């Protein structure tokens, strides 16, 4: 009898040890998940950034930040599949799918074709793409767009209130909707703040030339501009860096350029950066994951605006002490007015054209 009893104890110990090992192994596999979540509750989410990695001080990094926040708040397991080049887009999306992710998020319009193709081939997987949209969608694909006209208007309001010369500058990469949908509302907002303000507008016809951007900024300052807003990628970063170091107020775009261009305040001129007109990619990614977790994910275009914190002005950072409180209050009031639908921020130019005084070189 004692021999049989000993065998039962060994069996029980082995069973307990096996269960314990399985439990510990599950913790290693998913260190970011809640202990309250059972494996069947966990949702797998993959992020495929654009080339450049998740430390790009841009959309990739913001998307990764939104994913990390979702890991903290929801029962999800995340993975990132960075392509080394554009040639790897399709392969990395396929890797995301084959790993069992229920949602695969891609970043940037360059990945549009690869994302659409993957959505068509994998109808049981949800897909979302940052900063790209289509006219029609399959049932498992979401395009995230951003109300750049709202935050552009807000940036213009600030520019108009801060300008003493009554001349503001705008530098665009190309005369295309993603650029002009920031720039013309910027003008509109500035002229609401001060009807006498005029805008100098120059297109660089190049997104990748910071030296050219700096030259255009200096030219606009020579023509009287004391606030410069650049919507021109690295060309624009060169413009605002030069302008700020020469003593003009500047406004960045897309991301908080206080960190990407001014090194978090370590680069000369940061005190002349008023703000940045941001696309809050982090919030868009977070809310898309939240929809999947809640079972409310829908296909089509997701508009990220001031109301849902999908766009917004970056903090004033080192310039805050130089921005009068009544100006800060006015900008906050205009933001609320836009959210309430009380302020017309300008119809995109391809819908209808308005005539405002522009000085174009």
Question: Over which residues does each language-model region extend?
Answer:
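A residue-level marker of the well-folded mature domains of exported/periplasmic proteins
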Residues: 37-350
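Short, hydrophobic alpha-helical membrane anchors of single-pass surface/secreted proteins
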Residues: 13-17
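Sec/Tat signal peptide C-region and signal peptidase I cleavage site
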Residues: 31-35
């Amino acid at each position: 009898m004692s021999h049989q009893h000993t065998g039962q104890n060994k069996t029980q110990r082995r069973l307990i040890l096996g269960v314990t090992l399985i439990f510990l192994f599950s913790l290693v596999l998913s260190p970011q998940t809640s202990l309250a979540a059972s494996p069947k509750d966990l949702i797998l989410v993959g992020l495929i950034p654009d080339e450049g990695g998740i430390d790009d001080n841009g959309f990739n990094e913001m998307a990764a930040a939104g994913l990390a926040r979702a890991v903290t708040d929801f029962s999800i397991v995340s993975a990132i599949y960075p392509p080394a080049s554009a040639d790897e887009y399709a392969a990395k999306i396929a890797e995301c799918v084959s790993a069992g992710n229920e949602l695969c998020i891609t970043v940037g319009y360059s990945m549009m074709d690869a994302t659409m193709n993957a959505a068509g081939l994998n109808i049981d997987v949800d897909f979302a793409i940052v900063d790209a949209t289509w006219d029609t969608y399959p049932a498992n694909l979401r395009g995230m767009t951003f109300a750049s006209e709202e935050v552009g208007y807000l940036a213009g309001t600030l520019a108009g209130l801060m300008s003493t010369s009554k001349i503001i500058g705008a530098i665009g990469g190309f005369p295309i909707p993603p650029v002009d949908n920031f720039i013309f509302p910027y003008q509109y907002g500035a002229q609401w703040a001060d009807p006498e303000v005029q805008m100098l507008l120059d297109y660089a016809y190049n997104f990748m030339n910071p030296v050219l951007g700096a030259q255009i900024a200096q030219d606009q300052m020579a023509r009287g501009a004391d606030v410069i807003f650049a919507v021109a990628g690295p060309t624009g970063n060169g413009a605002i860096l030069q302008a700020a170091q020469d003593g003009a107020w500047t406004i960045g775009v897309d991301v908080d350029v206080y960190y990407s261009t001014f090194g978090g305040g370590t680069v000369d001129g940061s005190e002349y950066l008023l703000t940045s007109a941001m696309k809050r990619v982090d919030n868009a990614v977070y809310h898309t994951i939240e929809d999947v977790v809640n079972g409310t994910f829908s296909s089509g275009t997701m508009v990220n605006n001031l109301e849902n914190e999908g766009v917004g002005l970056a903090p004033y950072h080192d310039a805050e002490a130089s921005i009068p409180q009544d100006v800060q209050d006015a900008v906050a009031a205009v933001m609320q007015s836009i959210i309430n639908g009380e302020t017309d921020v300008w119809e995109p130019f391809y819908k209808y054209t308005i005539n405002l005084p522009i000085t174009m070189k």
